[in-house]
Amino acid sequence: MFDIGFSELLLFGVIALIVLGPEKLPQAARTAGQWYAKIRRTVSTLQSEIEAELDLAETRQQMQKELAKIRQTEAEMRREMAEMRGSMQEFESSKNQHLKASRDLVDDAKPRQSSQGSSENDDNRPVSPKSFDYAYDNNRQAEKPESSEQPSAQGDNDSLKTDFNDNANPVIQTITTRPWENMWFRLGAYDKARRLPQPPYLPNYKADILLNSHIDSLLPKQASVNEQESH
């Protein structure tokens, strides 16, 4: 600790022996040793405390650095979240605008279609099928010579023609939903185990010979008992 060698200690001992004498030298050496031990313990304690303080300072610096990194990452995450919220709001606004524009177009197209359909119904009359026209023409050719005798029959045919033309107009119905009748679904392993009951256990007498040997031993006894009862 004090960088003292063996020669210095020997010289110090000789001087102490000359000054103190042989009677007081052991007590002085003991006292010097105690003081030396106390000083060494004090120095080691101070050194350990200084090292602990240095370690504590280093740990504080590291903790401050880590806290700064955490705060930086938190600020970056908040900025990214704000950007994501802004992009989501822009997407929602654009989506709402698109839906509004499509609804406006549909609302504008509905009165046009209704006006066009009404004008077409007023201008165009329904056309009867060719088979009906052919049958009607044949009937009319056959009834030409008898037109003076049967005017009421022609009136009935005209009424039938108008009724058929009225019924010939197709009626379009939009099917929005589909019924769930006659539709089958394939069950998976999980649904089978959950919904279907467990199959009954059927013992295999050929494979489980040792387990079912007592049944084979009971059969002859039961047969002998039955024979005795019959006799």
UniProtKB/Swiss-Prot annotation:
Region (Disordered): 77-168
InterPro entries: TatA/B/E, TatB
Gene Ontology MF terms: protein transmembrane transporter activity
Positions of transmembrane segments: 1-21
Superkingdom to which the source organism belongs: Bacteria
Biased composition (Basic and acidic residues): 101-111
Nuclease among keywords: no
Keywords: Cell inner membrane, Cell membrane, Membrane, Protein transport, Translocation, Transmembrane, Transmembrane helix, Transport
Membrane topology listed for this record: Single-pass membrane protein
Main location: membrane
Polar residues compositional bias, start-end: 148-157
Subunit structure: The Tat system comprises two distinct complexes: a TatABC complex, containing multiple copies of TatA, TatB and TatC subunits, and a separate TatA complex, containing only TatA subunits. Substrates initially bind to the TatABC complex, which probably triggers association of the separate TatA complex to form the active translocon.
Similarity field: Belongs to the TatB family.
Record-given protein name: Sec-independent protein translocase protein TatB
Organism: Psychrobacter cryohalolentis (strain ATCC BAA-1226 / DSM 17306 / VKM B-2378 / K5)
